[in-house]
């Protein structure tokens, strides 16, 4: 899985090899183009997978194109890994506050951050079959691993090591998602930094971490790392955290984060 390793998202361990073989199989061979598709879906994240499977279940001829990891952010670098880490952080926080409920916790109880991240990778690998190329093929979707581009108003060209194909379509669904932009901060590139994607490749807890951006992702990661003991700085250009949310709700979150 050399191209996946280079992305910095997946450390080379057994669980991530299982994940990669499900969502970006190295020996995948793209099927022959099957005439004119009712719909070609670009991107196999949450939106793309749902579009493809609903179309196929209704009897449509569907092609699904993915150049990176099937499952998108949710499986690989979003919902699944973040909630695993957050759950572990909450368990640790509950344990530390257990005495206020009359529970006696033995002195010297510790957590293992490496084990927390290993559990996350194991859970992610275990459920990755649900978003795999083979499963969607079995469900009647033609899966193409490679980069797709519009060659005309009715064709998409797929290029990649799994085989180049030209796909004709009646409709196309663009489900390519988004990616966080890196702020233009002098020296940031030279200093090195994590993103909401690469942070889940950590194996050791950082002693100090600055989180730039206080949206939902920034806040949940900041709270999790703080609960594990990192000294966390949250930096937000706008007024307050969760600026797009109800202010009363955002203040409740802010107060809890400050306690953590």
Predicted ranges, named:
Residues 36-39, 231:
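A general secondary-structure boundary signal
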Residues 2-37, 50-60, 65-205, 238-242, ...:
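Glycine-rich flavin
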Residues 203-245:
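Rossmann-like NAD(P)H-binding beta-loop-alpha module
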Residues 42, 65, 235:
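The conserved SAM/SAH-binding core of class I Rossmann-like methyltransferase domains
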Residues 43-46, 67-68, 212-215:
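Glycine-rich Rossmann-fold phosphate-binding loop(s) that bind the pyrophosphate
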Residues 42-43, 94:
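Generic signature of intrinsically disordered, low-complexity, basic-rich segments
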């Amino acid at each position: 899985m050399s191209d996946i390793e280079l992305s910095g998202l997946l450390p080379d361990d057994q669980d991530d090899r299982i994940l990669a073989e499900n969502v970006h199989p190295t020996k995948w061979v793209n099927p022959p183009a099957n005439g004119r598709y009712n719909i070609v879906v670009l991107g196999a994240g949450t939106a793309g997978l749902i579009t493809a499977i609903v179309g196929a279940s209704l009897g449509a001829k569907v092609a699904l194109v993915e150049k990176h990891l099937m499952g998108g952010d949710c499986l690989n670098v979003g919902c699944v890994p973040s909630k695993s880490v957050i759950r572990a952080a909450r368990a640790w926080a509950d344990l530390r506050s257990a005495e206020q409920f009359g529970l006696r916790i033995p002195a010297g109880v510790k957590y293992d951050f490496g084990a927390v991240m290993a559990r996350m990778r194991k859970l992610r690998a275990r459920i990755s079959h649900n978003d795999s190329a083979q499963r969607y093929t079995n469900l009647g979707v033609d899966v193409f691993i490679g980069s797709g581009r519009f060659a005309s108003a009715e064709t998409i060209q797929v290029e990649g090591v799994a085989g180049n194909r030209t796909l004709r379509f009646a409709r196309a669904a663009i489900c390519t998602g988004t990616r966080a932009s890196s702020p233009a901060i002098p020296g940031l590139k030279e200093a090195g930094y994590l993103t909401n994607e690469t942070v889940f490749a950590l194996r050791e807890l950082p002693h100090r971490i600055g989180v730039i951006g206080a949206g939902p992702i920034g806040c949940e990661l900041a709270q999790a790392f703080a609960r594990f003991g990192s000294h966390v700085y949250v930096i937000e250009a706008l007024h307050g955290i969760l600026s797009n949310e109800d202010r009363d709700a955002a203040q409740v979150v802010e107060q809890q984060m400050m306690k953590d």
